[in-house]
């Protein structure tokens, strides 16, 4: 994150911090990039007398919002965040294309939605779970009808237990030496190039 961008971001976050102090009510950022999360955590001392929390809608989300809470805030922090989850699934699974993250993200951004209002998109077989800011829920539910060539239906998920856990794959490779370029090349199944 460039110093100028970081400066503007931290000014915006300072405004949210002051809003929380003066209104005695939580304030939230939009979904943050990795650089913004890092800058915020490095400058956490700038925000005394409030509780800073980050949440993305589910326990293992990568994209998160930052929330500034008054010190005497008693509600559950994660439930206070203005995040909702939308399940996007094909109307007719039999005729559905095989879709990847890029397809879902492209369909959502094609609606004119800013990337900072969209959190993680979790793909599970033929469906996807989209985390977004609460104020976009109705817009997405009524306007997202198609991803690639597949007709979709959307519904809000209120129980987070319905969202599948993140799946990981274990790959075993043998490398000639434990150098980073050999390990990365083995992971992406590429050969090392010599010039």
Model-found features: residue ranges?
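Ferredoxin-like alpha/beta domains used as RNA- or RNAP-binding modules
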Residues: 1-187
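Short, charged phosphate-coordinating catalytic segments
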Residues: 191-194
